[in-house]
Design a protein with these regions (language model features):
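C-terminal accessory/tail domains of diverse enzymes
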Residues: 29-127, 143, 154, 221-433
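Aromatic (phenylalanine/tyrosine) cluster motif
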Residues: 8-10, 23
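Surface-exposed, active-site-proximal loop segments in enzymatic domains
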Residues: 145-147
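Short, Lys/Arg-enriched N-terminal segments with co-localized hydrophobic residues
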Residues: 20-32
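Metal-dependent DNA replication initiation modules
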Residues: 45, 134, 138-140, 149, ...
Length: 433
């Protein structure tokens, strides 16, 4: 993508100074702030957990198969007190969800992710299928609705939007002290979420064709009336007032259909970040989860220090998310601070710099930085799918290779250093191609 020099001349000193102010503010925050107490009262990392959605596919053809209820009927039942992941239905019979345990460390999260994938695949194998972590089906598919009353009501009301909805997301929950802190976090992480989408992008195909997007799942999901970014809320009271205003329209069936990119959980004292595709590799997913926890921690520290949230509109954020959905990490993104085009590696570096103290405090910095570098160099699941398609000319091969990566055949190319961002004052390039 070409960006004319006039764009950078036009924004000139105004955005450069704004970027410098954000940079200096972050530096001061990083050097002076201590970690706030978490829910248990001690200065320990926040708890977090993940939910992964998988496609169920034929073990030979890669075609989605409507086997979710059959899988769960044969899967061993785990008590809620077991402390491990569990399996659940999603809206379509071609999907299974693995719900991970509450974790304190990145090592616990990645172990839970791998165990959840193992459980899902074990259940799928019991009916001749496999569980695969791709966010849309490369093969053409006609989804089969799970015949539960809520889903049937949704199908009646939303028609083709639900009938065609066969997408797999990755949801990260991070503990917050209360709803007020949670909303303060939501207001402060908004601008960073498109970078997470780019890093997770894993859905280039839809109904047998390359869509031209790295995450077409995000495009398909955006058809829902509440999907996407929100304006800033400012307080817990305003958040709940806004949600109630959506419910009183009668458009939504219930609060479960509040599909913001990030929201307060209805059932747990957590912030839930929902923007990401399910990642092909477990290590990618764990890194995304750690990035989310770092963002939540950084945002809470800013709030406790009285630092106001950024004043970006939902429209600006929608553009950034759209660009991330289109490009993944293979082209330009919108800069999280300046809202202008920049290389994907620069956007990732700015994110890492923003949350580095939080990552260091939780012991995640080295592992997450290395994994981000691998994603940038080796590519996301979207790039992997396209490379397989190019080399084999077979959508079935795309799916079956993804099955292997889902369950441990992880591709770790040589990690490359994440490029440092340009100086906000002197090194803003005059053109990019």
């Amino acid at each position: 993508m070409a960006c004319g020099g006039g764009l950078y001349s036009f924004i000139g000193s105004r955005l450069a100074v704004a970027g410098l102010e954000a940079f200096l503010l972050g530096a001061a925050l990083n050097s002076s702030m201590t970690r706030p107490p978490n829910r248990s009262g001690g200065e320990v990392p926040r708890t977090f957990g993940v939910e992964e959605e998988f496609l169920l596919v034929d073990a030979t053809t890669g075609q989605p198969v409507p086997a979710a209820e059959a899988c769960l009927a044969k899967a061993p039942q785990r008590p809620e007190t077991s402390g491990g992941p569990s399996l659940a239905l999603e809206v379509q019979q071609e999907q299974l969800e693995a719900v991970g345990p509450v974790c304190s460390t990145l090592q616990e999260v990645i172990a839970g992710i791998r165990e959840g994938r193992r459980l899902a695949d074990e259940a799928a194998r019991s009916v001749g299928a496999r569980a695969v972590a791709v966010a849309t089906s490369p093969m053409p598919a006609t989804p089969t609705l799970v015949a539960q009353p809520r889903f049937l009501n949704m199908a009646t009301r939303f028609g083709v939007t639900l009938r065609e909805q066969l997408t797999c997301g990755f949801h990260v929950h991070v503990g917050v002290n209360d709803g007020e802190e949670g909303v303060a976090v939501l207001d402060r992480i908004r601008r960073w979420l498109p970078v997470l989408l780019a890093l997770s992008a894993n859905s280039p195909f839809w109904q047998g064709a390359d869509t031209g997007y790295a995450s077409f799942r995000y495009q398909a999901w955006s058809r829902w009336p509440t999907a996407g970014p929100c304006e800033r809320f400012g307080s817990e009271r305003e958040y709940h007032r806004y949600v109630q205003s959506l419910l009183t329209t009668g458009v939504l069936l219930d609060e479960g259909m509040v599909y913001f990119d990030a929201r307060l959980s209805r059932n747990h004292p957590t912030v839930e970040v929902r923007i990401a595709d399910v990642c092909m590799e477990a290590s990618h997913a764990a890194a995304i989860a750690a990035l989310v926890r770092g963002l939540v921690e950084r945002a809470a520290r800013e709030w406790r220090s009285g630092i106001s949230e950024p004043r970006l509109s939902a429209g600006q954020l929608r553009l950034a998310a759209w660009k991330a959905s289109q490009s993944g990490v293979d082209d330009t993104l919108l800069h999280p601070l300046l809202n202008i085009p920049c290389p994907a590696g620069e956007a990732v570096q700015v994110l890492l710099s923003h949350i580095r103290p939080a990552l260091a405090d939780s012991g995640d910095e080295e592992q997450v930085t290395a994994e981000a570098a691998r994603i940038l160099s080796a590519g996301t699941g979207a790039r992997r799918q396209r490379e397989t398609m190019m080399s084999t000319q077979s959508l079935a091969a795309v799916v079956l290779e993804a099955v292997g990566h889902t369950h441990g055949v992880e591709h770790h190319g040589p990690a490359q250093a994440v490029p440092a961002p340009a100086s906000y004052l002197t090194d803003i390039p005059r053109s990019r191609s």
